[in-house]
Amino acid sequence: MLSVILFTEKLNHSSKNKDMAAKIRCGIITIHNIPNYGATFQALGLFRYLVIQGYEVEFIDYSMNKPMASNTCEHSTLKKLLSLPKKLLNYQYYLNSKTKATAFAKFWNKHYKLSKHHYSGDNEFFDATLNYTVAISGSDQLFNLSLTNQSEGYFLPNVKNYKISYSTSFGMSGLSGDNEEKLIRLLRSYDRLSIREDTVAEYLKSKYGI
């Protein structure tokens, strides 16, 4: 939360009243629409913190790139087919999953404020103009390119104003050799970085001065 606090303190110092604060528009990009308790509550926590400061806040309604075809497709398909009879027989599992997804959707509709436009993948997102005073990536594993199907949208490359990351994670992949050059290029565009993994943060600071 440190990078967010530092930024909001800077804004509060320059804002004379709540009316001025309300004119400050904050856009949050995160994995906001999966039925997962951790992802949902950490997204809502950041959202509520900024709203309490008096800012106009919304989630950028962005979906990561669709999975790319790979050589493991045949193996994955076979694995899914072998597990299909078990899932079909487990009707209670299906009902529980459906009930959970419905409950999450109701919660999101009640507590989230989304951008008016939905962006599906990088190609559509990069063409958009985002008019936020500040844009925030975080938290969750947005910097884990293996998890996000190489989605660069979570790095907000089309944001020209102030941009920070809040407690963003690289996941188990860390800074892998294949993605390191790409990640460094994307990370350098941030005004402030808050990273969850201490070892990665120290590595970025010592090797790249980030």
Predicted regions and their residues:
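Alpha-helix capping/helix-boundary segments
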Residues: L142, T199-A201
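Alpha-helix N-cap/helix-start capping motif
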Residues: L44, E197-D198
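Helix-loop-beta element that forms the nucleotide-linked donor phosphate-binding surface
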Residues: A201-I210
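A short beta-strand/loop micro-motif in the catalytic core of glycosyltransferases
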Residues: Y190-E197
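Aromatic- and Gly/Pro-rich donor/ligand-binding loops
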Residues: C26-Y37, F41-R185
